[in-house]
């Protein structure tokens, strides 16, 4: 191969040259500066020095100086585990009309499957779909002062969850389908069609609320209507997780002082009409009275007189005698012997009279007759010509 390349006058590639050929290609002038040359020469060892050192210590392998160990990095503080924020403050849910007669109202709607929002007066509960309009009417007996605001806040209804802040599930927080650019993604309650709405996160209680200025009713109207949206289903895992919630509506002045308070339960579901009809039927079956608006406790008390056990039937009176007319001597003798045998059996066993009558009626039912049960029979002897 080399001869063929030499004949053709082709030089081998650079990688095929010897080290001496490559060393000759280096420039003769010293690349190191004059200042660094002495120091570098002191560090270099000649081949004779290396051979002498190995002869003196053949058992010892050359050891390279260990580089200094890098300083151990300061361990970073562990990130706090993500958990639901807890609040030490539980807002009151007691109805307070105040001096302005503040109370809420809702539009009348049925339980059809097509409804997106319906209110049950018997349950004081609003059933609605996700992100659908929920009109809430604000009624006052006299106009509140200027600068009055309306605040809406959600809390859990059951006492074991009241300290937990109500917020949306992680899935709906990341979902951008219902984002309006105004409300924070973790807020459950939004106000529809009001650019003056303020979404607040309390630094002390960590609770979410939405505040809008109170507007007096329009001409020809007796109430003010605010359209709310609930942005997460009640069944969402990681959010409400099937835990009932209450929405508290408060009327406040410009300084935050309370002027009135009212509340109602909310269920966000796929079919509000069906769920309302089902819960109302269960409510009436249990015989519960209409619940008052939530006070100190959100649970309804069951009536003490309600009992699930069926009423017991009255037992027939003991010691009654009945006359049974039987046609035919042969049949009469058969029933008479049967009755005497039962009486004798009861006398020998020492049973109670009620038990003997029950056993006697059971035997008579097997014979195809239908006399009154639990009755003692008394027969009247008749002649062969009687009917």
From Swiss-Prot:
Give the position(s) of the covalent cross-link described as Glycyl lysine isopeptide (Lys-Gly) (interchain with G-Cter in ubiquitin). Answer: 24, 285-286, 345, 351
Residues that the record marks as modified (N6-methyllysine) are 364, 366, 376
- Cite the residue spans of the region called Required for interaction with FBXO42: 106-230
Keyword set, alphabetical order: Acetylation, Activator, Apoptosis, Biological rhythms, Cell cycle, Cytoplasm, Cytoskeleton, DNA-binding, Endoplasmic reticulum, Isopeptide bond, Metal-binding, Methylation, Mitochondrion, Necrosis, Nucleus, Phosphoprotein, Repressor, Transcription, Transcription regulation, Tumor suppressor, Ubl conjugation, Zinc
Q: Using the UniProt annotation, give all residue ranges assigned to the region (Disordered).
A: 57-82, 277-319, 344-387
Co-factor remark: Binds 1 zinc ion per subunit.
Biological process terms from the Gene Ontology for this record are:
cellular senescence; circadian behavior; DNA damage response; entrainment of circadian clock by photoperiod; negative regulation of cell growth; negative regulation of DNA-templated transcription; nucleotide-excision repair; oligodendrocyte apoptotic process
Question: Lineage in the entry?
Answer: Eukaryota, Metazoa, Chordata, Craniata, Vertebrata
Q: Where is this region: Basic (repression of DNA-binding)?
A: 362-381
Let me see what the UniProt entry remarks about domains: The N-terminal and C-terminal disordered regions undergo liquid-liquid phase separation (LLPS) following homotetramerization and activation. Post-translational modifications, such as phosphorylation or lactylation affect the ability to undergo LLPS. The nuclear export signal acts as a transcriptional repression domain. The TADI and TADII motifs (residues 17 to 25 and 48 to 56) correspond both to 9aaTAD motifs which are transactivation domains present in a large number of yeast and animal transcription factors.
Question: Which PROSITE patterns does this chain map to?
Answer: P53
Q: Which residues carry this modification: N6-acetyllysine?
A: 113, 299, 315, 367, 375-376
Database matches in InterPro entries: p53-like_TF_DNA-bd_sf, p53/RUNT-type_TF_DNA-bd_sf, p53_DNA-bd, p53_tetramer_sf, p53_tetrameristn, p53_transactivation_domain, p53_tumour_suppressor
User: What is the recorded name of this protein?
Assistant: Cellular tumor antigen p53
Role according to the record: Multifunctional transcription factor that induces cell cycle arrest, DNA repair or apoptosis upon binding to its target DNA sequence. Acts as a tumor suppressor in many tumor types; induces growth arrest or apoptosis depending on the physiological circumstances and cell type. Negatively regulates cell division by controlling expression of a set of genes required for this process. One of the activated genes is an inhibitor of cyclin-dependent kinases. Apoptosis induction seems to be mediated either by stimulation of BAX and FAS antigen expression, or by repression of Bcl-2 expression.
Record's comment on post-translational modification = Phosphorylation on Ser residues mediates transcriptional activation. Phosphorylated on Thr-18 by VRK1, which may prevent the interaction with MDM2. Phosphorylated on Ser-20 by CHEK2 in response to DNA damage, which prevents ubiquitination by MDM2. Phosphorylated on Ser-20 by PLK3 in response to reactive oxygen species (ROS), promoting p53/TP53-mediated apoptosis. Phosphorylated on Ser-33 by CDK7 in a CAK complex in response to DNA damage. Phosphorylated by HIPK1. Phosphorylated on Ser-386 following UV but not gamma irradiation. Monomethylated at Lys-366 by SETD7, leading to stabilization and increased transcriptional activation. Monomethylated at Lys-364 by SMYD2, leading to decreased DNA-binding activity and subsequent transcriptional regulation activity. Lys-366 monomethylation prevents interaction with SMYD2 and subsequent monomethylation at Lys-364. Dimethylated at Lys-367 EHMT1 and EHMT2. Monomethylated at Lys-376 KMT5A, promoting interaction with L3MBTL1 and leading to repress transcriptional activity.
Q: Where is this region: Interaction with HIPK2?
A: 313-354
Q: Which species?
A: Delphinapterus leucas
User: Could you tell me where the Basic and acidic residues compositional bias lies?
Assistant: 344-358
Spans annotated as Interaction with E4F1: 250-288
Question: Residue ranges of the DNA-binding region?
Answer: 95-286
Gene for this chain: TP53
The cofactors named for this UniProt entry are: Zn(2+)
Q: Where is this motif: Nuclear export signal?
A: 333-344
Q: Phosphothreonine-modified residues are where? A: 18, 278
UniProt: Zn(2+) binding residues: 169, 172, 232, 236
Please list where the region (Interaction with USP7) is annotated: 353-357
UniProt region (Interaction with DNA), positions on chain: 267-274
In this chain, the stretch annotated as Oligomerization covers: 319-350
């Amino acid at each position: 191969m080399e001869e063929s390349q030499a004949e053709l006058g082709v030089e081998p590639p650079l990688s095929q040259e010897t080290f001496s050929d490559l060393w000759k290609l280096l420039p003769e002038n010293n690349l190191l500066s004059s200042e660094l040359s002495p120091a570098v020469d002191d560090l270099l060892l000649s081949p004779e020095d290396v051979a002498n050192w190995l002869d003196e210590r053949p058992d010892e392998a050359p050891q390279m100086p260990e580089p200094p160990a890098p300083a151990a990095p300061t361990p970073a503080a562990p990130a706090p585990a993500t958990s639901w924020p807890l609040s030490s403050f539980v807002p009151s849910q007691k109805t307070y009309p105040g001096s302005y007669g503040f109370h809420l109202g809702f539009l009348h709607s049925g339980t059809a499957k097509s409804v997106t929002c319906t209110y049950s007066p018997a349950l004081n509960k609003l059933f609605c779909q996700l992100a659908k309009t929920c009109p809430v009417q604000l009624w006052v007996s006299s106009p509140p002062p200027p600068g009055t605001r309306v605040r809406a806040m959600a809390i859990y209804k059951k006492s074991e969850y009241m300290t937990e802040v109500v917020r949306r599930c992680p899935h709906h927080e990341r979902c951008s389908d219902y984002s309006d650019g105004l409300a924070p993604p973790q807020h459950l309650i939004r106000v529809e069609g009001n650019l003056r709405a303020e979404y607040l996160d309390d630094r002390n209680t960590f609770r979410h609320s939405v505040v809008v200025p109170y507007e007096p009713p329009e001409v020809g109207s007796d109430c003010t209507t605010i359209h709310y949206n609930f942005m997460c289903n009640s069944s969402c895992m990681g959010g409400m997780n099937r835990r009932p919630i209450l929405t508290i509506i408060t009327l406040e002045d410009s300084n935050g002082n309370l002027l009135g308070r009212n509340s109602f339960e909310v269920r966000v579901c796929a079919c509000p009409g069906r769920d309302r009809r089902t819960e109302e039927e269960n409510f009436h079956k249990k015989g519960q009275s209409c619940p008052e608006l939530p006070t100190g406790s959100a649970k309804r008390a069951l009536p003490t007189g309600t009992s699930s056990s069926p009423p017991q039937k009255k037992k027939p009176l003991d010691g009654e005698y009945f006359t049974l007319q039987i046609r035919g001597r042969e049949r009469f003798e058969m029933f008479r012997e049967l009755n005497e045998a039962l009486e004798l059996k009861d006398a020998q066993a020492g049973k109670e009279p009620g038990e003997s009558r029950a056993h006697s009626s059971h035997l008579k039912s097997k014979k195809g007759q239908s006399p009154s049960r639990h009755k003692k029979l008394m027969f009247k002897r008749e002649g062969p010509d009687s009917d």
